[in-house]
Amino acid sequence: MIESLAIWGGVDDGIIGPFIAAIFRPSLQPFMISWMNYNPQIEIAKLTIPVLIINGNNDLQVQVSEAEKLKSAKPDAVLVIIPNMNHLFKEIKGGLIENQKSYNDEDLPITKKLIKTIKLFILK
């Protein structure tokens, strides 16, 4: 799917299933195509301001290794890996099913460790 966006400049949502169509709907495709033109490591290295990189070790969408690549590209950045935090900044103590369910649980709070991390970074 990603390759089709990059190579062909779009995907016809009539040929893909409803779940994928929701993610790759035509209205989002221009954004996704432009987003693929950027390399996060190159972009973060250009920054001349303090940088805080936060990742959860329970993130289904962005692996810790991706945050580590950003840190390598910007050695003076602060990297914090928050235990049990997922992509939605929620603390997940269970496995994959609990993590997936959290995406629809608006009552699950943002992990306090995230808030403390951001606060300390701003105040420093």
Report the location of each language-model feature:
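The feature captures the conserved acid-bearing segment of alpha/beta-hydrolase catalytic domains
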Residues: S34-T48
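Short beta-strand/loop motif that positions the catalytic acidic residue
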Residues: L47, I53-N55, D59
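Accessory cap/linker subdomain of secreted extracellular hydrolases
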Residues: M1-S34, Y38
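Short alpha-helix in the alpha/beta-hydrolase fold that links the catalytic acid
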Residues: I49, V62-A73
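Acidic catalytic loop of the alpha/beta-hydrolase fold
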Residues: N58-V62, H87
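Catalytic active-site module of serine/aspartate enzymes centered on a nucleophile-bearing elbow/loop
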Residues: V78, M85-K124
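Solvent-exposed, acidic/flexible segments
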Residues: R25, I33, N37, L60, ...
